[in-house]
Swiss-Prot record:
Domain of life per record: Bacteria
Main location: cytoplasm
Pfam family, one: CutC
Keywords: Cytoplasm
Protein name: PF03932 family protein CutC
Transmembrane segments: none
Amino acid sequence: MIKEFCAENFTKIPQAIQKGANRIELCDNLAVGGTTPSTGVIEEVLAYAGEHSVPVMTIIRPRGGNFVYNDIELKIMHTDLIEAKKLGTDGIVIGCLTEDGWLDEEALDLFIETAEGLQITFHMAFDALSKENQFKAIDWLAERGVTRILTHGGPAGTPIEDNFDHLKELIVYADQRILILPGGGISTENVQTVMDTLKVTEVHGTKIV
């Protein structure tokens, strides 16, 4: 069972690991859904988590808001990805879309190639796709060796329990080609229900431990 703790900077990480978090998604600025953490934060978290054999997934996201990025933002993301890889992150968390509601294939191809050797999570930008495109995106991301997709299974703010049916559809369709990682609204109180209902071995959240 992997409980991925979504952390804003370093502060809560020691306590989370002590309580049983066995993977970290590292962000800054969770008020806007998480943005790229600073070099200093990445370094300190990798050092601490490394001592406890806990892998770290570093989010690469230049700002809050939507997931459609211009050329300068994509360049910033690419530089940040290279830096996080140099620092020794175990994986990266990315997601970028086009204006017309599909994956930004060109940008993602570059990021996936640059991240070779790292785990890759495609984040909740996935939830901004239409349901039809979500299934196509599973194919596209799985073909390129992306490790997992983080998804709430429905609109942000809905109880995750309301989205179990769609999450089950995604899990069945993914068919172990790529891992579906449920997140958003999972806490210590419902984590066992989520795992039992969806038959998943990995879950994600800020209140997961």
